[in-house]
UniProtKB/Swiss-Prot annotation:
Protein's cellular compartments: Cytoplasm; Nucleus; Membrane
Function: Acts as a tumor suppressor; induces growth arrest at G(1)/S checkpoint and apoptosis via RB1-dependent and p53/TP53- and NF-kappa-B-independent mechanisms. Modulates expression of genes involved in the regulation of proliferation, cell cycle and apoptosis.
Protein name: Apoptosis inducing factor BLCAP
Record bears the keyword Metal-binding: no
Protein family per UniProt: Belongs to the BLCAP family.
Pfam family, one: BC10
Species the sequence originates in: Carassius auratus
InterPro entries according to UniProt: BCALP
Membrane topology: Multi-pass membrane protein
Principal place of residence: cytoplasm
Listed transmembrane segments: 19-39, 43-63
Amino acid sequence: MYCLQWLLPVLLIPKPLNPALWFNHSMFMGFYLLSFLLERKPCTICALVFLAALFLICYSCWGNCFLYHCHDSPLPDSAHDPNIVGT
């Protein structure tokens, strides 16, 4: 389970509030995971545990899935705040 110490923090990285950055974020996360899996070659149990956690987060539309944005889940209230200046 040593491999999970590098995989589990990936699930805690928040998605950006700006919808224009979602594609860039998902591409970065996808390439990070792909390069990690190719370079470190985690054990089968760690890979299955991580993929199960990723599937459950994305299937539940919890809002932190970096693969896609669930259409049923609304944007956070701070995304519509005009006082926040986007870059």
